C-alpha cells in the first residue's frame, strides 16, 4: 500500500515542537492548556491525528516532563473530541561533543536512555507515538539514535500496544526501519512519516518523495511533510502521489508568505482545502483508524 490517490487523506497536525517559539509566532502553544486546546481546535478543523511535544511553561523550552505529557493527554481526552493522539519520543537524542574531549557530551547535549524516552508512552498509551529511525547531523548537534536504543524503544512501544510512526529524514533511514521490521520490532502495516526539507536530510521535492515511497515495504502507509515554505507544496505533492499529510506550527509558522499562521487550525484548514481542491477527501478519525489498523 505505497499510495492510493483515491483513498481519503489523513491530516496530522504537529501542534508544537522544539524549535518554533512564541517570540517568532505568538500562536505557538506552550502550556499544557494551550497545547491541548490547540490540538482540539486542529481536530475540529479536520486533523485526524495530533502530534504533541511538551514545553516548560516558564522557559518555553522543550522538556520530557511526564506530568506535562499527562496534563496534555488528559485534557484532550476529557474534551470529548475524537482524535488520534500521537506523542513524540524524539527528545533525548541530541549529542554534541565537548571541545576538550570528543567522547564526552557537551552541556548542550540531551541524551537519555531508551526507557526514559518512552516512559510517557508506556504510562499514557496514546494510539500512536513517533519513532525517529534516524541518526544525522544537524547544524549544532548530532541527532543520535543508536541501533540498540531503537530496538529497545520499539520493543517497549510494541508491548504497550502503541503504533509507531516511523519518522525518516532520508533514504538510509528507511533501510534502518526495514531492518527493525525484519527483526520483528515493527508490525504491519507500518506507518512512515517522510520529514523533508530539514538541513542535511532529504529535500522537500517530488523526486525525494517518489524515491522514498518506492523503497517502502509493500503494505506500508506513508505521509510526508515539508518544513517552513515547503509545507503546503508537500501537501499537494503527497496527495497527488497517494500519501497522507502533516501540517502544524512545529514545522511551519506561516499561513502564506509573510503572514503568520493564527493557529494550528488555520494550517489544517488550508491543508484540507488543498486536498479537496485536488479532488481528494479528508479522512475522518474513523477512516484514519481503519487505514492505520488501529484498534481503539
What is the meaning of each model-derived region?
Residues 60-89, 152-159, 211-219, 265-275:
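Alpha-helix-loop-beta-strand connector modules within alpha/beta enzyme cores
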Residues 127-250, 261-266:
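Catalytic alpha/beta core domains of metabolic enzymes, predominantly
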Residues 32, 69-144:
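Active-site beta->alpha loop and helix N-cap motifs at the rims of alpha/beta catalytic domains
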Residues 35, 42, 53, 129, ...:
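Conserved, mostly hydrophobic/aromatic
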Residues 2-27, 91-92, 97-100, 130-137:
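N-terminal small/glycine-rich loop or linker at the start of catalytic domains
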Residues 23, 48-72, 138, 195-196, ...:
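Glycine-rich, proline-tolerant flexible connector loops at the mouths of alpha/beta enzymes
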Residues 269, 273-296:
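Mid-to-C-terminal alpha-helical segments outside catalytic/metal-binding sites
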Residues 13, 32, 36-37, 47-59, ...:
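Histidine-centered catalytic micro-motifs
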